[in-house]
UniProtKB/Swiss-Prot annotation:
Disulfide bonds: none annotated. The keyword Iron-sulfur does not apply. Belongs to the krueppel C2H2-type zinc-finger protein family. The lineage of its organism: Eukaryota, Metazoa, Chordata, Craniata, Vertebrata. Keywords: DNA-binding, Metal-binding, Nucleus, Repeat, Transcription, Transcription regulation, Zinc, Zinc-finger. One of its GO terms (cellular component) is nucleoplasm. A zinc finger (C2H2-type) spans 15-37, 43-65, 71-93, 100-123, 129-151, 167-189, 202-224, 230-252, 258-280, 286-308, 314-336, 342-364, 370-392, 398-420. The gene is Znf672. This is Zinc finger protein 672. SMART domains: ZnF_C2H2. It holds the Pfam family zf-C2H2.
Amino acid sequence: MFTAPGMATTQERPYSCSVCGKSFQYSAVLLRHERAHGGDKRFCCLECGERCARAADLRAHRWTHAGQTLYICSECGQSFSHSGLLDLHLGTHRRRSRTRPCRLCGRRFPHVPALLLHRARQHPPEKPHRCPLCARSFRQSALPFHLARAHPPEIITVTAPSPSTLYHCTQCPRAFHSSAGLRNHSRIHVVPSLSDPGTEAHLCGICGKSFSKSSTLTRHLQRHSGEKPFKCPECGKGFLESATLVRHQRTHTGEKPYACSDCGRCFSESSTLLRHQRSHQGERPHVCATCGKGFGQRYDLVVHQRSHTGERPFPCPQCGRGFTDRSDLTKHLRTHTGEKPYHCELCGKRFTCISNLNVHLRNHAGHKPHKCPECGKSFSVASKLALHRKTHLGERTAECTECGKFFSHGRSLSQHQRSHRRARAAAMAATTTTTVVTEVTIGPSLTLTGPTEQEKSGLLVSPFQETC
């Protein structure tokens, strides 16, 4: 992580007020505080002339003119014009409080699902009985069943454990690096035993795969037939298994039962949560062979590699623009249709994607979690903080192609380029000559105009011109 020279840690408060002795972490915060002592009240109310030291104090004062009730946060004293905004703001305090403790280690969590996930991962129930073949652990009652199902002695032979352990098939010379690979392979050697119906295997007549239960074979055959018996009542989409339908229905209900124990973010599927937690652990197992950049999820690596190859497999059917990710295409299509499915319940403003709505809600709640380590200024999104920090570092990466001037923000460059366009338009207006043609009406239906180009050149004689 980037650390600026002389940057204070989260515990240090090196900037002290010379009047009251109060300490601050950032010099910019100290300057704002000292204005209250020095009488520097630069923010003036246009209604009554009242002056305030801070913009926040002026905003609170202006509500008194509007005759609206202020909703004050009992935790920090911040005021809001709407009870819904106060509720959103209070959520930031509730997330910090972490009121749900783990009875085993005392760690506190903001959500019950986060607590349950923590207990499952950090305090799993004891399973003292370890399988000697695959190292899985079980309670006493489950181990014999696992041995009978996963490691049938007539098929599997396991070599002595070593760093290069191989699992050898007793029916053919093939060997495998994992017991699961050997189990999948061993199905091709299993034949139904007519003499022992209890051990009869259920074979798929299409691909030859065998199953221990007829119900499992029936479910497998549905994959070949394309049958999807479980239909979503909302959109009609079909699924092979009921569990897949349950996960799909969460996209309609918005239910997200799996919460991250580190940041409280919720997800609709446990697999998505596990992939998300890699970002907290710093785990990036998927590495780009071209530039060496690491990713926590394989799909993110696939999308990233398209930036090297130039592949854009998702074209827009309206304008032909290509995208590297299907989700980017979905958001782009809304610019053509005008669809904005996500709306703010406080002000009614609508958005094309949920991430923009979340950023908008932070503005309502005054929640700005991204703080500049140099001056203490806070931002609601990380991208705005990154742009802001360029002003401290002196980076100017956006260059004007017309005059060569550099800017730290793309937005500043766009505003600058408008001045070039205005200058060009003014120059064109000044150099363009406009020909004014006057008309003289003679009689009710005869109109006399100025000379045409042909008449000027002498190629055509006007009927109203005398000839010699």
